[in-house]
């Protein structure tokens, strides 16, 4: 079974600006949905430019305390909180807290941020995997690309094969473990590279021509699962490398 891509079209007699505004209106009133659609977003601070991946709980709480004084409503912990990630060569896919940096885990840190009167947000890059990761070592066939030739990298990372249900389910399970304690109010969903090497290991030649579309359907499946199970969490897409707006 294969579902072809959907297209969204509008008409305007007022040129490109009118067409752009018609698209905005259509998406905001008919296609966007959920708890956050018409609500004002909280004012947030993100630690990325302040620390990159060089942080521990003490440093994060120090930034959060200053943010609290400024009236910031949401603190977002960016890349580097999971696996053994101290740089961008490792640990994507290993979505469990780095207890060396955060000895009380995400739950403990989130509680301390909330005690300051702010909500807590967290960075994920769900569609990606590092070659130096427990996930890749356990499932090298879960990466997009042929197993008998080199696969292109971007930012030292690879793309997971979201055309496979078991991959989507696994990543969903790991994310739900983190989100399930109720401490995370916001998710920054990143995607820092383009999709290439469109080959799904173990599939026949006919299937390969549908991989790109099935990949995005897999992303949508994960969107649907998480927004259904966590309707009050604000999910924000950040895809400087992926060039998407979904």
Where are these regions (language model features)?
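Acidic/polar, glycine-enriched structural segments that form the non-catalytic walls/loops
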Residues: 11-39, 53
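Short Pro-Gly-centered flexible turn/kink motifs
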Residues: 1-13
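Aromatic-lined carbohydrate-binding/catalytic grooves of carbohydrate-active enzymes
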Residues: 36-172, 186
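Pocket-edge structural micro-motifs
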Residues: 7, 47, 181
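A generic structural signal for short, non-catalytic loop/turn and secondary-structure boundary residues
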Residues: 2, 36-38, 228
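Generic detector of well-ordered alpha-helical packing
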Residues: 7, 77-80, 189-191, 237
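A generic secondary-structure signal for well-formed alpha-helical elements
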Residues: 12, 27-31, 71, 117-120, ...
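Active-site neighborhood of glycoside hydrolase catalytic domains
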Residues: 98-105, 111-115, 136-246
């Amino acid at each position: 079974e294969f579902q072809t891509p959907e297209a969204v079209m509008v008409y305007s007699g007022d040129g490109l600006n009118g067409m752009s505004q018609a698209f905005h209106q259509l998406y905001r009133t008919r296609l966007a949905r959920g708890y956050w659609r018409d609500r004002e977003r909280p004012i947030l601070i993100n630690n990325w430019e302040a620390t990159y991946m060089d942080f521990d709980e003490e440093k994060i709480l120090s930034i959060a305390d200053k943010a609290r004084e400024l009236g910031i409503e949401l603190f977002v912990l960016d890349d580097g909180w999971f696996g053994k990630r101290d740089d961008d060569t490792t640990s994507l896919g290993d979505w469990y807290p780095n207890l060396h940096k955060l000895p009380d885990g995400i739950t403990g840190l989130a509680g301390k941020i909330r005690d300051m009167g702010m909500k807590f947000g967290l960075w994920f890059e769900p569609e990606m995997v590092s070659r130096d990761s427990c996930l890749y070592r356990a499932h090298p066939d879960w990466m997009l690309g042929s197993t008998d030739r080199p696969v292109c990298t971007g930012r030292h990372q690879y793309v997971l094969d979201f055309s496979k249900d078991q991959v989507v389910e696994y990543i969903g399970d790991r994310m739900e473990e983190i989100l399930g304690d109720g401490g995370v109010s916001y998710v920054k969903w990143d995607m820092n590279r383009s999709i290439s090497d469109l080959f799904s290991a173990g599939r026949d030649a006919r299937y390969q021509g549908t991989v790109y579309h099935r990949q995005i359907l897999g992303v949508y499946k994960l969107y649907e699962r998480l927004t259904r199970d966590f309707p009050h969490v604000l999910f924000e897409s950040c895809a400087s490398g992926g060039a998407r707006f979904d």
